Amino acid sequence: MFQNNPLLTQLKKNLHAKSPRVEGIVKSTERGFGFLEVDPQKSYFIPPKNMKNVMHGDKIIALLTTEKDREIVEPEKLIEPFLNRFVGKIEKKDNRLFIVPDYPFLKDLITCQPNKNCINIFQNGDWAVAQLKKHKLKGDHLFYAELTEKITQEDDPLIPWWVTLARHDLDRKEPLAEDDDLILKESDNRKDLTDLDFITIDNTNTKDIDDALFVSEKNNGDISLIVAIADPTAYIKHGSKLDVIASKRIFTNYLPGFNIPMLPRNLSEDICSLNPNKRRPVLACHITVLKNGNISNKIEFFLAWIKSKSKLSYDHVSDWIEKIGSWIPPTKSIANQILILHRLCLLRIKWRKKNAVLFKDSIEYRFHVSEHGKIIDVLIEKRRIAHKIIEESMIVANISAANFLSKNIGFGIYNVHSGFDLVNAENAVSFLRSYNLNFTVKEITTLKGFCNLRRVLNIISNNYIDSRIRRFQSFGDFSTIPGPHFALGFSEYATWTSPIRKYSDMINHRLLKSIIKKEKSIKPGEDIKIKISEQRRRNRMAERDVLDWLYTIFLQKKKYQNQKFNAEITDISRSGIRARLIENGANVFIPGTLIHPIREELNFNQESGKVFINGIMHYKISDLIQVTLSDIRLKTRSIIAKPVFEKFK
């Protein structure tokens, strides 16, 4: 009687049209069902049958219904697929190709074929780049992808590097130089400073040496500093093929074990590199650091020839200053250079401590990797006095460049940091007040007030308070016009000391040269500023991904399960604690199930950065705890830890 009843059909359509819809991101689980996350506080259950047409990460619109007194959602419309261009591993079954996306929550095989422009032949276990072409929620009967590029084969020891670079669509090889790129274009009107005892201080294995220093003391206690910087723009014409390549790469990409240079290695590591006893063209800056640590207003930029007299290492110089080890400077003159540079460094640290912002010393971790990609060890590296000598010299040079650009043309590529926006400033003030630290919004949104806040926090030396305040701070950025850098404590700051490695520094080199030569200066466009920020983000993500991969390999091979590690809590998420192992720098995740067996009694408060059990605070960001490793998952590059349940001091 009711079959094919147009009134009933229309009624169903009307009810369906009036049913509420929700928009959100699909979150899958290992047990087949999923959730639609509408916002950080609200999510809806997706039954297993409804998960078959979507993938983890898809942005969708779903129909909200009730089933057995529980709200559930039924995916209805795809807004944005999680997968577009992606990387994955090939599986071959019955001569058919499938690809498994390389993402933690995506485990299903996707049917695939090479596209018409892909000449590679794919075997089982190969890694590939693919493009999702069909999606079930779009009405297609299957998920389907086209293979666009083979990354590497299953037995390649460099898989973590190649796959990560492909994932972030980053270059794998150095650019090639043409003959014209190796010819010096700017040889005239350079001061000959080859008789001065310039020195370089760097890591022992550094080949792309950007900076050399020469210092002398004046009778009144002031220090004369000449910073000489490698001059790749003397070889690379603006708008040339190589310049365009550099403008796309933006940075030399430093990954654990090796780097992918912005410029050809025969330029970055030979012709332009300030190697010892080689005559090199440079862009130089003559600065006077007054005996009170301030920088004199008299700043001179000029083109020059120099010849570095010695390539020194951070460790050797630090050992000699600290009077340990057997190394001594090769000549008395170089020994004198080190002593004056040390004095300059101490003057500037004292000045910055009083007038700007000093960074806390931090530990860095470096993978020692063989040429064939084998992990040998993870080394702990601390910033020593020689690192600070170079850092202070480069800071002086960059402040000087910013002032010089602003005074003469009013633009360049500036590093800027705005401190707090208004909302976060209010939150920061409220938080500080709870610790009896009284600041006003007006105060901490000025450069002077921000610096004062940072100095107070350094004196208090409370890592929890420090981490919370950093959470309220803005991110660093780039600007084509002068602006303050609150995090450094300077009214303006522009880098130019790494033109071999940074395209932004090449831009500033060209602007500085245009002022020196009294030529027309062309203001950089906003598009290049955006490109610099985006490329920096992608490079950092690639470095993080490679590190995560290497740590899982390293810890698996070392069989570290059940060994106790000291760790620092770095973040509190919705479902657990993130921490860093102090011994080797590995990031680990401690899920709630390993912290307390009853989920309802757990409260992960992301806002405060604390974990409560039955209302009592047990953990907070910056706490030092002991953990054991319970699971090391190579497929998802994740390390699962559990607390030993006793904090250590």
Swiss-Prot record:
Reactions catalysed according to its record: Exonucleolytic cleavage in the 3'- to 5'-direction to yield nucleoside 5'-phosphates
GO cellular component: cytosol
Occurrences of domain S1 motif (ranges): 562-644
Record field: transmembrane: none
RNB domain location: 190-517
Entry-linked PANTHER family: EXORIBONUCLEASE 2 (PTHR23355:SF37), RIBONUCLEASE (PTHR23355)
Keywords of the record: Cytoplasm, Exonuclease, Hydrolase, Nuclease, RNA-binding
Single Gene Ontology BP annotation: mRNA catabolic process
Function: Involved in mRNA degradation. Hydrolyzes single-stranded polyribonucleotides processively in the 3' to 5' direction.
GO molecular-function terms, A-Z: exoribonuclease II activity; RNA binding
Pfam families, per the entry: OB_RNB (PF08206), RNB (PF00773)
EC number: 3.1.13.1
Entry's family note: Belongs to the RNR ribonuclease family. RNase II subfamily.
Subcellular location per the Swiss-Prot or TrEMBL entry: Cytoplasm
Lineage top rank: taxon: Bacteria
Name listed for the protein in its UniProt record: Exoribonuclease 2
